Design a protein with these regions (language model features):
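Short, solvent-exposed loop/turn segments at the edges of extracellular beta-sandwich modules
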Residues: 115-119
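Nuclease and nuclease-like effector domains acting on nucleic acids or nucleotide cofactors
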Residues: 34
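Detector for intrinsically disordered, low-structure N-terminal pre-sequences
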Residues: 19-23, 70, 83
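Short flexible loop/turn segments that cap and initiate beta-strands
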Residues: 57-82
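Surface-exposed loop/edge segments in extracytoplasmic proteins
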Residues: 78-86, 178-179
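Beta-strand signatures of extracellular beta-sandwich domains
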Residues: 69-73, 84, 170-172, 181
């Protein structure tokens, strides 16, 4: 489109109203608002298995179009990193499957990046906990802890031979989960990686020795 300059307007004897009529472009269309709704989440998984998130994308409060991209992002090093992409099906429904390979515990979210017709939207999902299976036992009886302090029946924590003192460990057993620090050294039995304190054992419903899931 050629824009009429004031000089040209004088030359052509055009009125100001005529100039405005020729240079005003149509306003761009307003983008549709969007929202993500999560209907199911499976975020506690063993390494080598898939985390799964299902939901629906809405556009202006109505089921979204098929074929729109929805991504899963994890929080790492103060940034959100996209780890897997999916696309909506009929009714704006989406399903994201993420193969979890490395033990970790991180915040995750789903995001619709937006396009030329619809605005972007984001929904926090929770924490993705990727576990590995480890042998564990429990101990009690009081005494001094290698990381400082005294062991009591209410002390929450674990003993480990190599993790630094204070390292937080997410442990899952029988559908229960706790996050506790490394407070002691041990266990000193071949094949075992963690000794749970009595309070940690009770919180998990763990008895004797056996396999627990750990994010470390």
């Amino acid at each position: 489109m050629h824009t009429i300059t004031p000089t040209e307007a004088l030359t052509r004897d055009l009125t100001p109203a005529t100039i405005v009529d020729q240079v005003v472009a149509p306003e761009p269309p307003t983008k549709e608002s969007t929202a993500l709704h999560v209907t199911r989440r499976e975020l506690n998984v063993l390494e080598g298995h898939r985390a799964r998130i299902t939901g629906r994308l809405l556009e202006n409060g109505r089921p979204g179009s098929p074929g729109l991209m929805v991504v899963l992002q994890r929080r790492a090093a103060r940034r959100w990193l996209t780890v897997v992409r999916s696309h909506t099906r009929g009714g704006g429904r989406f399903a994201i499957n993420y193969l979890a390979r490395t033990p970790r515990s991180e915040s995750v979210r789903v995001r619709f990046p937006g396009d030329e017709l619809a605005s972007s939207s984001t929904r926090r999902v929770g924490r993705l906990n990727v576990f590995r299976a480890v042998e564990a036992s429990w101990y009690g009886g009081g005494g001094s802890l290698a990381c400082g302090g005294e062991l009591t029946s209410s002390t929450l924590g674990v003993a480990n031979k190599i993790l630094p003192c204070g390292t937080l460990v997410d442990i899952r057993y029988g559908g229960r989960s706790v996050t506790v620090p490394v407070i002691d050294r041990g266990p000193f039995v071949a094949g075992r990686e963690f000794d749970l304190t009595e309070a940690t054992k009770d919180a998990l419903g763990f008895a004797g020795t056996g396999v627990v899931w750990s994010t470390r």
